[in-house]
UniProtKB/Swiss-Prot annotation:
InterPro entries in alphabetical order: Aldolase_TIM (IPR013785), His_biosynth (IPR006062), HisA_bact_arch (IPR006063), Isoase_HisA-like (IPR044524), Isoase_HisA-like_bact (IPR023016), RibuloseP-bd_barrel (IPR011060)
GO CC term, one of those recorded: cytoplasm
Stated name of the protein: 1-(5-phosphoribosyl)-5-[(5-phosphoribosylamino)methylideneamino] imidazole-4-carboxamide isomerase
Family: Belongs to the HisA/HisF family.
Location in the cell: Cytoplasm
Pfam families, sorted: His_biosynth
Gene: hisA
Active site location: D15, D136
Length: 261
């Protein structure tokens, strides 16, 4: 029987679009919904509530191919004592270095990993342990360029490729679940975890404590990113931390035994 994680790192997300904190629905920019008046104040609020880490995505950068919201990202990083990981439009060694020099803990690359594997490898060598790959997929097929393009590449295949190139970890997002609160794609996550030799963080669709407990039962999964579930009030950060974070008080319900299959 494979081991389960003792706990998950529960990571609030802040997605930046035109300087605002928003949430998308299934990756659709036309359905962007503002979720906070001030991204910096929201970041500080998550940290004050006990978040161990913050996940920031520059949606403008993901679309354009170059980070757009750098001033806001810098203010977030400088205002927090917790680590911040950033993705969106990081497609060069220079941009990765710039973000890390600002104090970002991890950079997350997506399109680069698919389209420019040589630069990915150079990046992982230049910044060991600090380059993660975001694998975003529709029906198992990897999407790039801010989720606007879908490739024939299957997610597990990309996992194997990028870990061989030195990626420190994987953030897997099921686009069809993102922003829906419909639950994570456990079957696809199992396929990712079956081939991954690096830490994996799940994102997309998490809408309840039951979803988090289901994720906790998956072997080698180390974290979960929460967006709409927190902003809609479906889950409070404190509840999530108590359920699956370090020192959690809630055991797995018996029915999650089926998740081993």
């Amino acid at each position: 029987m494979p081991y389960t994680s003792a706990f998950l790192e529960v990571i609030p997300a802040i997605d930046l679009l035109q300087g605002r904190a928003v949430r998308l629905y299934q990756g659709d920019y036309a359905q962007a919904e503002q979720v906070a008046d001030d991204p910096i104040q929201q970041a500080e609020a998550w940290a004050a509530q006990g978040a161990p880490r913050l996940h920031v995505v520059d949606l403008d950068g993901a679309k354009s191919g170059d980070p757009v919201n750098l001033p806001i990202i810098e203010r977030i990083v400088r205002s927090l004592a917790i680590p911040v990981q950033v993705g969106g439009g990081i497609r060069s060694l220079e941009r990765a270095r710039q973000l890390l020099d600002l104090g970002v803990d991890r950079v997350i690359v997506g399109t680069l990993a698919v389209e420019d594997p040589d630069t990915l490898e150079a990046m992982t060598q230049a910044f060991p342990g600090r380059v993660w790959v975001g694998i975003d997929a529709r029906q198992g097929q990897v999407a790039t360029r801010g989720w606007l393009s879908t490739t024939p590449l299957r997610a597990p295949e990309l996992v194997q490729r990028v870990q061989a190139q030195g990626a420190a970890g994987i953030i897997y997002t099921d686009i069809s679940r993102d922003g829906t609160l419909a639950g994570p794609n456990l079957e696809q996550l199992r396929q990712i975890l079956a081939v991954s030799q690096v830490p994996v963080i799940a994102s997309g669709g998490i809408g309840s404590l039951t979803d988090l407990l289901a994720l906790l039962s998956l072997p080698r999964l180390t974290g979960a990113i929460l967006g709409k579930a927190l902003y809609s009030g479906a889950i409070s950060l404190q509840e999530a931390l108590r359920a699956v974070g370090p020192g959690r008080w809630q055991d797995l319900p018996p029915e999650t035994g089926s998740l081993w299959a």
